């Protein structure tokens, strides 16, 4: 358990640095208001209730930190997704965005949604896009996108509007 907790701590530090970098870039390109969206992402990393539950689940179920973090984060996301308020329901996407970053860092994977490989202007079709991925879109390469989930109040939609990228969410 101590090794798994140490790995989690390192992944949280790395994720925080990544989110701060996204926030900095968004602030430069879109302004402070849009960059403040990522304050909620940073708060997830500091949520003691969530982190304590991850520790408890690891100990009780004797599972890896990846499994425990994934299970707990998805439980929180489902809870948010079930709330009868559009704004709060959209925060489930934020939880999943942060969880994906943490899990990728635990697993040593590259950042999710890296579209630097696009060679020509494209329209992106996806089940979902996180706000942090959307914020990093190159307007010269991404002409627009469509997702199955989201709404006009989602952080992904806000990022698209700020970048002036047409989107159907």
Outline where the language-model segments fall.
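Non-catalytic, soluble scaffold/interaction modules
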Residues: 1-169
């Amino acid at each position: 358990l101590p090794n798994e907790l140490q790995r989690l701590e390192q992944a949280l530090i790395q994720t925080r640095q990544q989110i701060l970098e996204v926030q900095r870039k968004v602030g430069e390109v879109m302004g402070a208001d849009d960059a403040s969206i990522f304050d909620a992402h940073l708060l997830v990393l500091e949520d003691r209730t969530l982190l304590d539950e991850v520790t408890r689940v690891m100990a009780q179920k004797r599972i890896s930190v990846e499994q425990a973090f994934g299970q707990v984060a998805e439980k929180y996301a489902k809870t948010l997704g079930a709330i009868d308020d559009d704004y709060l329901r959209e925060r489930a996407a934020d939880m999943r965005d942060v969880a994906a970053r943490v899990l990728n860092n635990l697993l040593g994977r590259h950042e999710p949604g890296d579209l630097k490989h696009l060679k020509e202007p494209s329209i992106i079709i996806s089940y979902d896009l996180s706000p942090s991925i959307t914020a990093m879109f190159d307007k010269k390469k991404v002409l627009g996108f469509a997702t199955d989930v989201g709404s006009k109040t989602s952080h992904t939609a806000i990022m698209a509007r700020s970048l002036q990228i047409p989107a159907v969410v």
